[in-house]
Amino acid sequence: MTDALSIARDLIRCPSVTPADAGALGVLENALNAAGFTCHRVTFSEPGTADVDNLYARIGSEGPHITFAGHTDVVPAGDESAWSVGAFSGEVKDGFLHGRGAVDMKGGIACSVAAVLEHLAANGGKPRGDGTGSISFLITGDEEDVSINGTIKLLKWAAERGETFDHCVLGEPSNVETLGDTIKVGRRGSQSGTLYVDGVQGHVAYPHRASNPVPDISRLIVAISDEPLDHGSAQFQASNLEFTSVDVGNKANNVIPGEARAKFNIRYNDNHTQASLRELVETRLAKACGNRIKARIVWEPSNSNVFVTKPGPFTDLAVSAIEEITGRKPELSTSGGTSDARFISSYCPVIEFGLVGQTMHQVDERVPVKDLEKLTQVYRGILTRYFG
């Protein structure tokens, strides 16, 4: 069966807890091969990480080229005894499809595959009746964890083969409360770092022989984070810097520590680049340290840069398709955390539209069967408009 519900159930029954595949990519590969796609299974490796399988499938050789992206790996089920049905049973109960990945995001992938198969069947097995156009799938098994051997490498692999993409739909659960309420058109960037403050270790009874870094790091945390980084932009909320831990590595209560450190993360908008953001924080630190406090920031490598797909013909056709099927005009949003769209945005404009995310990563993750049907129709509408 190639309807969205059947595909989603088959995918959920593959316990593909990241980074395991457990047969999930095979479900998709079989369906796409049968429809005339050329499929490539690509395995990527990195020292210290698990090897991960990925799938690239394409039909057509000309433009315009639209690609559907997603991930088949899922987070662990947690306490499976707490589930009302088996976490990997793919059971339909009271009009809902239950199972880990039903929302995030095997359900969305199933809808995109079902929509593409229906579209091809209506057009003589081709993306467009005149034989032009291309449709592809970029599917990874490495999104829920480190995201090292997944989409970022699959895109590079495809580019090295001469593949180019005009537009992408990523089927992440973008909607907040109801199907049709939100399209994600961008994401803030993410940058992490650790603040280190030097002190001099010593006995608490002789503070004059030591230098306590704890009061100093407290002052620096306030100096760095108290003033807003900005006040937002036309398409993004304000950037925010949040300290997430403070530690001195000291288990003795009679020893002044020799060093203090604090971890932080910044979510930043298009008022900043990664370089300008780091410079802003470093400037605040230097001013607060003066000539007395010795401190430094160690920045973590980051490939989560800010991006936005600006309103235009592609977002317009997506909004039109969503409004026709759901009766709602979606908000073009840049809220939320990071996704693989941050990698895709370097290759082509990308939007995120999938299911409602309320139960993702929860016990009894589930999606209304009617939402699977509607999302399939939305994707059909996008394809019809795209190749119309």
Curated annotation (Swiss-Prot):
Zn(2+) 1 binds at residues 71, 104, 172. Keywords: Amino-acid biosynthesis, Cobalt, Diaminopimelate biosynthesis, Hydrolase, Lysine biosynthesis, Metal-binding, Zinc. The keyword Zinc applies. The active site is at 73, 143 (proton acceptor). Its cofactor is Zn(2+); Co(2+). Binds 2 Zn(2+) or Co(2+) ions per subunit. Its EC number is 3.5.1.18. Coiled coil: none annotated. Pathway: Amino-acid biosynthesis; L-lysine biosynthesis via DAP pathway; LL-2,6-diaminopimelate from (S)-tetrahydrodipicolinate (succinylase route): step 3/3. It is an enzyme of class 3 (hydrolase). GO terms for biological process: diaminopimelate biosynthetic process; lysine biosynthetic process via diaminopimelate. It catalyses: N-succinyl-(2S,6S)-2,6-diaminopimelate + H2O = (2S,6S)-2,6-diaminopimelate + succinate. GO terms for molecular function: cobalt ion binding; succinyl-diaminopimelate desuccinylase activity; zinc ion binding. GO terms for cellular component: cytosol. Zn(2+) 2 binds at residues 104, 144, 361. InterPro entries: Bact_exopeptidase_dim_dom, DapE_proteobac, Peptidase_M20, Peptidase_M20_dimer, Peptidase_M20A. Homodimer. Belongs to the peptidase M20A family. DapE subfamily. Catalyzes the hydrolysis of N-succinyl-L,L-diaminopimelic acid (SDAP), forming succinate and LL-2,6-diaminopimelate (DAP), an intermediate involved in the bacterial biosynthesis of lysine and meso-diaminopimelic acid, an essential component of bacterial cell walls. This is Succinyl-diaminopimelate desuccinylase. The lineage of its organism: Bacteria, Pseudomonadati, Pseudomonadota, Alphaproteobacteria, Hyphomicrobiales.
